[in-house]
From Swiss-Prot:
CDD domains: PLPDE_III_ODC. This is Antizyme inhibitor 2. Keywords: Cell projection, Cytoplasm, Cytoplasmic vesicle, Golgi apparatus, Membrane, Nucleus, Polyamine biosynthesis, Pyridoxal phosphate, Transport, Ubl conjugation. It comes from Homo sapiens (Human). Belongs to the Orn/Lys/Arg decarboxylase class-II family. ODC antizyme inhibitor subfamily. GO terms for molecular function: arginine decarboxylase activity; ornithine decarboxylase activator activity. The record marks K70 as: Not modified.
Length: 460
């Protein structure tokens, strides 16, 4: 079918055959390869992304999803999301070029970085990208000079003190400073059309969204009073991408819907969208990593046995990827990755205190420690799930690693859902609700039943 994604872009997974099965085949093939060089690789379930999209539309029907390109800019991800009709949130010139290269129109792109280089602003102006964010006077001055026709979105600060990744110290203007910026924009004939915020990643309190929406309402009133035509509300990101998150996406959506009904009721003429990254891709990616070396370290008390029956030693495993690459979440998000063994150990196998280390020659490249694992060997593969966010393209040439290869997969059911999506966009007809599992992943067993597929229109 015509569109951004074609069948040649992925492996079609038939019913009864999961991406876990595909991953096993790929690790077996890698182990049997004649070359002695092995490399970690991803398997990406594009069907899981399709399923997440329909879940989003069901839970937040008034909100247009925009994808945060910085989270995972791999071609398969961009193409499937483009096929689904998403807009794209770009942080720099390279990301704007990337999405325009696959055919995304400028009207579906927002340059959401409040602090941009002049070259990035000029690129947006030259290529018709109108929607830009800002949070300071210097940014306004750059826009006046390089892109005077831009439609600006004022980024406000939020209370993200409980988030794992806080952004308000770096980005966002306080409420008391908003009027001054809005007046400055009016003085220089810069059009401000809306408000954005970002509560940070891993926020455990959904009410942070409600408070930020209430704050945005105040800024809308300031802008309207000063003569700005305010009609864009950007809810930012921070939405969880895994089922095991402290706060479920559905809980956050419920709070957002209530706040929108109160402060931006339906029919108010405001275009609402969100910038989602982790939500779409985290659970869709699984990575296989090879053990490249190991050593056994005896504990201090020879002959001592642990309570679980293991002998008194700890085993150090060296992997071909570490915290300076795809496991950077260990450093930045304080996450301890848990490996999945390709072969399930028997209950009779002893377990040993174990740790996993990356290839860097320093003491900080520890992927995980305090693990209890059976005896593993050089050449064995470890599998890690929920690896889709901020991992792709994270190779480190300094340590001799390259960006990991990605094998994309999708179930036939999900592919047919995409076909219907495209036909709906082309013919402007409603499509049937999708009432079958859309993911070919091994974790997803429930079904999804949603109404007509929503295709975002131009943001301008």
């Amino acid at each position: 079918m015509a569109g951004y994604l074609s069948e040649s872009d992925f492996v079609m997974v038939e019913e009864g055959f999961s991406t876990r099965d595909l991953l096993k085949e790929l690790t077996l093939g890698a182990s049997q390869a004649t070359t002695d060089e092995v490399a970690a690789f991803f398997v990406a379930d594009l069907g899981a992304i399709v399923r997440k999209h329909f879940c989003f539309l069901k839970c937040l029907p008034r909100v247009r999803p925009f994808y945060a390109v910085k989270c995972n800019s791999s071609p398969g991800v961009l193409k499937v999301l483009a096929q689904l009709g998403l807009g794209f949130s770009c942080a720099n010139k390279a990301e704007m070029e990337l999405v325009q290269h696959i055919g995304i129109p400028a009207s579906k792109i927002i340059c959401a970085n409040p602090c941009k280089q002049i070259a990035q602003i000029k690129y947006a102006a030259k290529h018709g990208i109108q929607l830009l964010s800002f949070d300071n006077e210097m940014e306004l001055a750059k826009v006046v000079k390089s892109h005077p026709s831009a439609k600006m979105v004022l980024c406000i600060a939020t209370d993200d003190s409980h988030s794992l990744s806080c952004l308000s110290l770096k980005f966002g203007v306080s409420l008391k400073s908003c009027r001054h910026l809005l007046e400055n924009a009016k003085k220089h004939h810069v059009e401000v059309v809306g408000v954005s915020f970002h509560i940070g990643s891993g926020c455990p309190d959904p009410q942070a969204y409600a408070q930020s929406i209430a704050d945005a309402r105040l800024v809308f009133e300031m802008g309207t009073e000063l003569g700005h035509k305010m009609h864009v509300l950007d809810l930012g990101g921070g939405f969880p991408g895994t089922e095991g998150a402290k706060v479920r996406f559905e809980e956050i959506a419920s709070v957002i819907n209530s706040a929108l009904d109160l402060y931006f009721p339906e029919g108010c003429g405001v275009d609402i969208f969100a910038e989602l990254g982790r939500y779409y891709v985290t659970s869709a990616f699984t990575v296989a990593v090879s053990i490249i070396a190991k050593k056994e370290v005896l504990l201090d008390q020879p002959g001592r046995e642990e309570e679980n029956g293991s002998t008194s030693k700890t085993i150090v495993y060296h992997l071909d990827e570490g915290v300076y690459g795809i496991f950077n979440s260990v450093l930045f998000d304080n996450i301890c990755p848990t490996p999945i063994l390709q072969k399930k150990p028997s209950t009779e196998q002893p377990l040993y205190s174990s740790s996993l280390w990356g290839p860097a020659v320093d003491g900080c490249d520890c992927v995980a420690e305090g693990l209890w694992l059976p005896q593993l060997h050089v050449g064995d593969w470890l599998v890690f799930d929920n690896m889709g966010a901020y991992t792709v393209g994270m190779g480190s040439p300094f340590w001799g690693t390259q960006a990991c290869h990605i094998t994309y997969a999708m179930s036939r059911v999900a592919w047919e859902a995409l076909r219907r999506q495209l036909m709906a966009a082309e013919q402007e007809d409603d499509v049937e609700g999708v009432c079958k599992p859309l993911s070919c992943g091994w974790e997803i067993t429930d079904t999804l039943c949603v109404g007509p597929v929503f295709t975002p229109a131009s943001i301008m």
